[in-house]
């Protein structure tokens, strides 16, 4: 399904960001340098791309459709996903706070990142392998086409066009700089 494939493609970019974040944490903990823009750039990537672009599509459009099609929120997979979105936002907030005010609190950043990385990896696994499979079973072709159109509309309305390419390139650059 096109709309689900689109969410999975965004997961791929987010997972590459997690890989780079994990390498950066290793460098931070061994007191090695990281790119100067990374302490502020990484939380920005996860807040803007993972949350405002990706999670917003899920929360505002995709999950409500799944609820209409009978997938429960309370006590079900959607409720779990929403809770994990909130926990992830808190981790990103703490990473951002660690790099504010011209000071970089390496320990605070690393601690928040080490909580965030496994949380989001497990979250993506559950969505890709459980929730999206459930969605494919309850969504019609018309639902899929409509959802894909709504994803495009949201990207246009919220000035998110080009965000995939921008952040994919930024993650690739960081990956090259953080060995």
Question: How would you name each of these model-derived features?
Answer:
Residues 1-179:
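Small-residue-biased structural context
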């Amino acid at each position: 399904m096109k709309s689900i494939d689109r969410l999975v493609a965004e997961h791929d970019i987010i997972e590459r960001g997690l890989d780079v974040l994990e390498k950066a944490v290793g460098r931070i903990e061994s007191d090695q340098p990281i790119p100067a823009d990374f302490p502020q750039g990484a939380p920005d990537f996860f807040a803007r791309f993972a949350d405002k672009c990706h999670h917003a599509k899920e929360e505002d459009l995709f999950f409500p459709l799944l609820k209409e099609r009978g997938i429960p929120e309370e006590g079900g997979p959607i409720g779990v996903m929403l809770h994990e979105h909130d926990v992830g936002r808190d981790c990103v907030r703490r990473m951002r706070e660690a790099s504010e005010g011209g000071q970089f609190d390496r320990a605070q950043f690393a601690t928040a990142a080490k909580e965030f990385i496994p949380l989001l990896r497990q979250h993506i696994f559950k969505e890709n392998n459980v929730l999206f499979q459930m969605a494919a079973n309850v969504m019609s072709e018309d639902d899929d086409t409509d959802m894909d159109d709504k994803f495009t509309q949201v990207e246009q309305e919220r000035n998110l066009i080009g965000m995939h390419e921008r952040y994919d390139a930024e993650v690739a650059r960081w990956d090259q700089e953080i060995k």
